[in-house]
Amino acid sequence: MSTGFNAQSFLRTVSSSAGVYRMYDVKGDVIYVGKAKDLKKRLSSYFRKNLGNVKTQALVSHIHHIDVTLTHSETDALLLENDYIKQYMPKYNVLLRDDKSYPYIFLSQHEHPRLAYHRGPQREKGYYFGPYPNGGAVRESLHLMQKLFPIRQCDDLYYKSRTRPCLQYQLSRCSAPCVGKVSNAEYDEQVKLASLFLKGKDKQVISELVAKMEEAAEQQAYEQAARFRDQIMALRRVAEQQEVSGNTGDMDVIGVHYASGIACFHLLFIREGKIFGSRSYYPTVPAQTDIEEVLRSFLLQFYLNADIQRTIPKEVVISHHFEELHELEAAVSEALNKKFSIKTNVRADRASFLRLALTNATNAVMTRLSHKNTVEQRFVLLEEILELNAPIQRMECFDISHTMGESTVASCVVFNREGPHKAEYRRYNIEGITPGDDYAAMKQAISRRFDKIDASGKIPDILFIDGGLGQLRIAQQIVDEKFVNLDKAPQLIGVAKGESRKPGLETLIFGDTESSFSLEDDSPALHLIQHIRDESHRFAITGHRNRRQKTRNTSTLESIPGIGPKRRKALLQHLGGLQEVKGASVAELAKVPGISIEMAQTIHDALRG
């Protein structure tokens, strides 16, 4: 592909300073960002006669022009390169998509503090413990905390509305401070111990509880001593189960495995010598990218992502050494204004943690490769069955979900040659049709999906319709209209269930000819079709249930005179849900902010009929 770029003329204008370069294609999109200690030397390497790397050949063939920015040092170049990669997301760079904030356990500064899951800006006053690698780790920790420390986990509105202990008190998971079942001093003591435990100071917590147990026994408060004994035993069991090192402090341990174009960075989050949790990251890696670039790009993007609230330790242990390690250390230290070290040659506990991280990374890549090969095999077989001239790169599937015509939702799921591509999934809330009219729902969904499609848009090679011939005809009609002026259009295939509706008995129908065929129930190609069909159904029904619940909550309360969105929200938040509102007495309803005794009576009468 010729882009008209004159490399010799350009290189004559480039200096030998440190800096960053941005490569653009003919459309003006940034396709690659790089940095160099010597820009002239680095950029000249792209235009040698013999380029051995296929990735570099493809990149150079698309260059239309190059912008260069000089920097004072290589450290500055590293930081600017990272900023540009985050800004432009170039297709030939290694990209880490880590846009979710990290979850924490939150301990509030209330008179009776609560423990809660928290993700996002830390605006509320209190203490934040973490970050945890994922939401599951936080929920697991909160569940454990309930068993160890009887501290409330309910929100403040629910706490204020209690007139008697809730189920958590009966299960010995909360001491019910809301109704005075525990003194402030006793509750504060449990909060203090929970805080120490979350900081990793298990031994100190156990020591304090042992002292309290002995003191209670001396005072012949045997019931209280028994509670402390049970708490100590539970804590010791937990401590035995957790892998702890006494001298490692806070650090991230990263095992890296890179094979067949798949890179996995498995992180162990070590805090106070304890594994807080782990998480695998899979950056997008262009073909034939060398390991040095993968390592450098990941570490920069991971530790310099200001959009993510992440506590960064002073020490990182990683399984691979690379040439620019010390420059990267300096760049991160400068950007964060704190000491930051990366180690690769470690012993004792650090070596043990590193082996664990590396094993997990290796296993993760092997699993992904196995899955990738399985999916690839299914794609190839489907291409053979459909007698296609070109490989399938993108498939989509539509499904409709509703309950007796209520809250209709259409789903569109996307598969590429690696399987589900969830970032491309879409839902469509269907409006303005006769309830239960699946044909009209399908027509609206397909129309909205391809409303402004053009040749440069994301056109599926195969478009599956989960339904019979009627829905398929509607979809084919819309596709014919939308693609009339384009050279390419998707092949439509209907997936109709058999009379018994059992998996393996599906009939497949071509949209253009309406001819039908079936596949053997053990066919890998059929398994691929079933996978995308089932995923479309799951995504549609989840969206429908969420919409239906929201609609029912809204319509039930807002049909009552005087109840608008604000009062509805206050009622649901204060009492905990629609069923709790329906079961509340007039007095309980009147405790909700903004609800008078007269309004409470009106709500009570309306909901009780």
From Swiss-Prot:
Annotated Gene3D superfamilies: 5' to 3' exonuclease, C-terminal subdomain (1.10.150.20), GIY-YIG endonuclease (3.40.1440.10), UVR domain (4.10.860.10), UvrC, RNAse H endonuclease domain (3.30.420.340)
PROSITE patterns given in the database record: GIY_YIG, UVR, UVRC
CDD domains noted in UniProt: GIY-YIG_UvrC_Cho
GIY-YIG domain sequence ranges: 16-94
Superkingdom in the source lineage: Bacteria
Record GO terms (molecular function): DNA binding; excinuclease ABC activity
Subcellular location: Cytoplasm
Pfam families: GIY-YIG, HHH_5, UVR, UvrC_RNaseH, UvrC_RNaseH_dom
InterPro entries: GIY-YIG_endonuc, GIY-YIG_endonuc_sf, GIY-YIG_UvrC_Cho, Hlx-hairpin-Hlx_DNA-bd_motif, RuvA_2-like, UVR_dom, UVR_dom_sf, UvrABC_protein_C
Keyword annotations: Cytoplasm, DNA damage, DNA excision, DNA repair, Excision nuclease, SOS response
Entry GO CC: cytoplasm; excinuclease repair complex
UniProt KW Ligase keyword: no
A biological process term (GO) from this entry: SOS response
Domain UVR: 203-238
Protein family (similarity comment): Belongs to the UvrC family.
Quaternary context: Interacts with UvrB in an incision complex.
The protein's role, per its UniProt record: The UvrABC repair system catalyzes the recognition and processing of DNA lesions. UvrC both incises the 5' and 3' sides of the lesion. The N-terminal half is responsible for the 3' incision and the C-terminal half is responsible for the 5' incision.
PANTHER family noted in UniProt: UVRABC SYSTEM PROTEIN C (PTHR30562:SF1), UVRC/OXIDOREDUCTASE (PTHR30562)
Protein name per Swiss-Prot or TrEMBL: UvrABC system protein C
Top-level taxonomy: Bacteria, Pseudomonadati, Pseudomonadota, Gammaproteobacteria, Alteromonadales
